[in-house]
Amino acid sequence: MPLPKFMIIATLALCLALTGCTQRPSDGSTCAECHRGLEQVSASHLECVSCHGGNPLAAAEKAAHRRMFGPKNPADPKYWEKTCGKCHPYQLERVRANLMYTNTGMIKNSQATWEGEDGVLYATRAEAVHDAGGEPLKLQKVTQLDNLAGELYRKTCSLCHVGVDSNRVWSGSHSSGCAACHFPYNDNATYQGSDRTVKGKWKHSASHKMAVLPDNSVCVRCHNRSGRIALSYEGWNDGNNSKVPTSKGHLGERVISGARNATRIQPDIHHEKGMECIDCHTSRDLMGDGYVYENMYLQTEISCEDCHGSATERPQVEEIDRENEEVLRESAHYPRRMQQGDSMVLTAKGRKYSNVLQEQGKVWVQSKRNGKLHESKVITDTPEHTIVGHERMECYACHSRSVAQCYGCHTEYDQRELGEDFIKGYKTPGRFTETEDYRMLYPFPLALNQRGKVSTVTPGCQTFVTVIDSRGRKVRDEYVTLFKGRQQLRFAPFFGHNTGPKAIGCAECHANPAFLGFGQHVVEDSSIEATLICEKSEDKPLDGYLTMQYGRV
């Protein structure tokens, strides 16, 4: 008796489903016949077509690759809803609202410091998301921002955000979408695995094996410019004359993107102890929590006080009391998985860390990669942290070893030349070039930050803009852009990621005018005279935001 047609269809569907859930390409797949030696993504990922698409039964290359996603990167935002998002919808929704993808904060601050905000929140792509209060929000695509601030972002800053495949910068390239962090490039963006069909080819991740826990090399591919936090953390500096060989005409100890020579400085104490970026930063810091924030400090959920306590309060803890808590899922990839009943330290937003716990009254940080436990010193009620008048000090105001400071950014925009628009994907009239006056690490000025606390600050940004129109006329010449309605040099609150165990001494901080915002000065009698004077602001030092006349600030 012949089987009913619906039973045949159901049986075929079941077979396809089962073969799609195998951990390696099935015997019927032709993928492995060409891609011999290709690394398995992970033990839990499905067969090739589940991520890449294509036809696994075709023998000819063109036929097999037809309708592939990418084809090299199925994690690109063009395809991620059909690929990564099918199995990881929760993570995808978080990343779609994440600052490293939307760049809303970077775009907004570019507007604020160049031509002013217009009340619209722009992003790398138009997205329907939710704001920090949970209200629906429509982000507008930054290609609609048709002014100098929009041009600046699209032609310079945007190359680092995870929505763009940045593959043209030696040692600074990365893939796009989820692959930007989880399938990292090497310095040349070439594949170095065992599959001979793509061995040494550009542009590919270094391996086909997924980096579940991205290492510091992933972070440094983007965070090596601007605030240079990835460099500072590991103890590198690309300061003044970084393109000049440093010893007997030879290159420096480390060459980084842009043919810059990086030299050694004292690294962050956490790096010295063997901690990586991911040991402090949570997945919500890096991938977002599903809500759109207008600035980085609003998305970041960690603080020094989380692990070390404040002057008056110890670190806050909470037990894992549910079997489906996110902590348990995330820590499954660590050498020591957290268990129900563990007392987990809370972030500044009141969420549990997945690797920081309290045991027998002590706070321990587990390195996510190797499982090493680091005891976190709690400073609560110690004499040196309860000094009267220091209540408003951020921890890093005293404990920063250095802060990257770039003074005098001279930006030229020439409409006679073409510049690559990385968001539009093609060249348009208008090319940016930049030079700087002076770079330094120490001393660094202090000022109030967004939390109302005394914080380290850095120029952000001191931009002198020259605009040349299509006829070669200088429309603007070394123009100091407006900020809050007037021309002024600006400083921005900034944590330099170069922390030391020993604080700056009392005399050093209180007797050095640079820490107070007067810049580096020569003190003579009752007057303070700047040694770095800005030609566009004769009464204001380039490296300070305060001036003094007749004993008054």
Residue spans for each PLM region:
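Bacterial N-terminal signal peptides
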Residues: I9-A17
